[in-house]
Amino acid sequence: MQALSARAPRVAAKPVSRSGARSAVTVVCKATTVRSEVAKKVAMLSTLPATLAAHPAFALVDERMNGDGTGRPFGVNDPVLGWVLLGVFGTMWAIWFIGQKDLGDFEDADDGLKL
C-alpha cells in the first residue's frame, strides 16, 4: 500500500527564465473562518476607546502649525496668506480672461473642435 503525503513534490533544478518568457503565476486559496473574522473585529474595536479618549489632544494647534482642521477658512492662520491666495487666484483668472477673448464666441457647436 502506498502512503499519502501532504507535501508538494520537490524539483531538483530551478526553472530557467528567459528574458522574453513570462513567469508562472501562482494562485493561493485561503479559507477564512468565522473565528478569524471575529478576531479582526475585536482587535479593531479594542482601539476605539483609546482613539476617543485621545481625540481632544488631536485638536491642539500651535502658532507654528498651519491651521489645518482648526475651522479657519482654507487653513489660513495669517492674513498675509489669505492675500497671497487671493492674489494668485486673481492673477490666474485675469490671464485666462484676457486670453479667452481671442478664441471667439463659439456660437457654432463645432467651433471648439478644430485643431
Curated annotation (Swiss-Prot):
A Pfam family this chain is assigned to: PsbW
Membrane topology of this protein: Single-pass membrane protein
Keywords: Chloroplast, Membrane, Photosynthesis, Photosystem II, Plastid, Thylakoid, Transit peptide, Transmembrane, Transmembrane helix
InterPro entries listed in its UniProt record: PSII_PsbW_class2
Keyword Repeat attributed: no
Stromal side: 100-115
Transmembrane spans: 79-99
Superkingdom of this protein's organism: Eukaryota
Subcellular location: Plastid, Chloroplast thylakoid membrane
Biological function: Stabilizes dimeric photosystem II (PSII). In its absence there is a reduction of monomeric PSII.
Subunit: Part of the photosystem II complex. PSII is composed of 1 copy each of membrane proteins PsbA, PsbB, PsbC, PsbD, numerous small proteins, at least 3 peripheral proteins of the oxygen-evolving complex and a large number of cofactors. It forms dimeric complexes.
Protein name: Photosystem II reaction center W protein, chloroplastic
The species this protein was found in: Chlamydomonas reinhardtii
Lineage, uppermost ranks: Eukaryota, Viridiplantae, Chlorophyta, core chlorophytes, Chlorophyceae
Gene of this entry: psbW
